[in-house]
C-alpha cells in the first residue's frame, strides 16, 4: 500500500476516444500489449496497456479503456495501436468474447505478433508464438490461478520499480 500511495500520475500527451498516450512509439523499441475484453454494454471495460519492454524498468506508454466498444470493433483499435507501436506483441485474454477478438486479429486482420498459450495440463499455460507442437490457443485463458500468479508478479514488479506507469486510471484501479 505504501508504494501505491507514492505513485504520481501525469496527464497523457494525447488522449482520444479512450486511448491515452503517455510516450509516443520510438523506433528500435519493443512493445507488448495486454488486452482485456468486455462485452461493451457499459459495465466492465475493454482495455489494454502498451508496455515498452526494451529495457528495465519496463514502462507503460499507452492505455486504452472503454466500456461501450463492441467486441467486433475492438480488434481494429488493438490492431492500429499495435502496428503504431512497432508491431507490438499482443497477449489477449480469451475468456468469453475475448476469443472472438483474438480470432479476428489472427485470421481476419492477419496480425503476426499475437501471442499464444500452450496448454500443459496441471502445469498451466505457457506463453509463446504457437510453435511448441502442443495444444495451443490464441491468447491466455484467465483462471483464478492465472490471475493470482499475474497479480503477485505485477505487485513485485511495481514494488521493485521494474514496471513504471503514471496513468491515473491504472493507479486508481
Regions found by a protein language model. Give the residues of each.
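C-terminal accessory subdomain/extension
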Residues: 122-123
Amino acid at each position: 500500500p505504501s508504494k501505491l500511495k507514492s505513485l504520481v500520475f501525469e496527464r497523457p500527451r494525447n488522449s482520444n476516444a479512450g486511448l491515452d498516450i503517455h510516450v509516443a512509439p520510438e523506433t528500435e523499441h519493443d512493445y507488448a500489449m495486454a488486452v482485456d475484453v468486455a462485452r461493451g454494454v457499459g459495465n466492465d471495460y475493454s482495455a489494454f496497456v502498451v508496455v515498452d519492454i526494451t529495457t528495465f524498468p519496463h514502462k507503460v506508454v499507452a492505455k486504452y479503456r472503454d466500456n461501450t466498444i463492441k467486441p467486433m470493433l475492438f480488434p481494429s483499435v488493438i490492431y492500429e495501436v499495435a502496428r503504431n507501436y512497432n508491431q507490438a506483441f499482443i497477449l489477449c485474454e480469451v475468456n468469453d468474447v475475448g476469443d472472438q477478438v483474438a480470432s479476428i486479429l489472427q485470421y481476419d486482420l492477419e496480425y503476426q505478433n499475437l501471442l499464444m498459450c500452450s496448454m500443459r495440463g496441471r502445469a498451466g499455460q505457457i506463453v509463446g508464438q504457437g510453435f511448441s507442437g502442443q495444444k495451443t490457443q490464441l491468447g491466455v485463458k484467465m483462471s483464478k490461478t492465472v490471475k493470482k500468479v499475474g497479480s503477485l508478479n505485477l505487485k513485485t514488479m511495481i514494488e521493485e520499480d521494474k514496471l513504471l506507469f503514471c496513468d491515473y486510471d491504472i493507479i486508481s484501479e
